[in-house]
């Protein structure tokens, strides 16, 4: 069916306003709950996408320095006691660890997408590590 062009028409008074039902009128006239405004919430996934863009732009380390340092010292205790670390050595370890984790999560995401999912799961990480040859 062909579309027709609509033209503006002059109003001739129109209809009288309809009467509201009793329940609607009661709902509108009821006092509000103190005017408390609900906090704004973004749709699910919006904040996650914003964080992804923010972290992909940034170059700073994402793991906090002191907790990482404590973890390194704790693991090193198992091999030899009274080990000392230069701050640059801890920094180099942290750079390497974060680069490894970012790469692993990229591969994990590809595994999830291959399975037609958007959420990564434990089995995706296991598959990514298996394909890399890290885990038999």
From Swiss-Prot:
UniProt modified residues of type N6,N6-dimethyllysine: 5, 15, 28, 37, 80
Protein name: Histone H3.1/H3.2
Entry comment on modification after translation: Phosphorylated to form H3S10ph. H3S10ph promotes subsequent H3K14ac formation and is required for transcriptional activation through TBP recruitment to the promoters.
Residues bearing the modification N6-methyllysine: 5, 10, 19, 24, 28, 37, 80
Residues modified to N6,N6,N6-trimethyllysine: 5, 28, 37, 80
GO molecular function, one term: structural constituent of chromatin
Segments of this protein annotated with the region Disordered: 1-43
A cellular-component GO term for this protein: nucleus
Quaternary assembly: The nucleosome is a histone octamer containing two molecules each of H2A, H2B, H3 and H4 assembled in one H3-H4 heterotetramer and two H2A-H2B heterodimers. The octamer wraps approximately 147 bp of DNA.
Alphabetic keyword roster: Acetylation, Chromosome, DNA-binding, Methylation, Nucleosome core, Nucleus, Phosphoprotein
């Amino acid at each position: 069916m062909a579309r027709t062009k609509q033209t503006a028409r002059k109003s001739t008074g129109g209809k009288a306003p309809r009467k509201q039902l009793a329940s609607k009128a009661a709902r509108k006239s009821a006092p509000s709950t103190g005017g408390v405004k609900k906090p704004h919430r973004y749709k699910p996934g919006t904040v996650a996408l914003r964080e992804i863009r923010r972290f992909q732009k940034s170059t700073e380390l994402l793991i906090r320095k002191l907790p990482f340092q404590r973890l390194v010292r704790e693991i090193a205790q198992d091999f030899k006691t009274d080990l000392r670390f230069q701050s640059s050595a801890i920094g180099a370890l942290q750079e390497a660890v974060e680069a490894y984790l970012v790469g692993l999560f990229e591969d994990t995401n590809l595994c999830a997408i291959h399975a037609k999912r958007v959420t990564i799961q434990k089995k995706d990480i296991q598959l990514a590590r298996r394909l890399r040859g890290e885990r038999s």
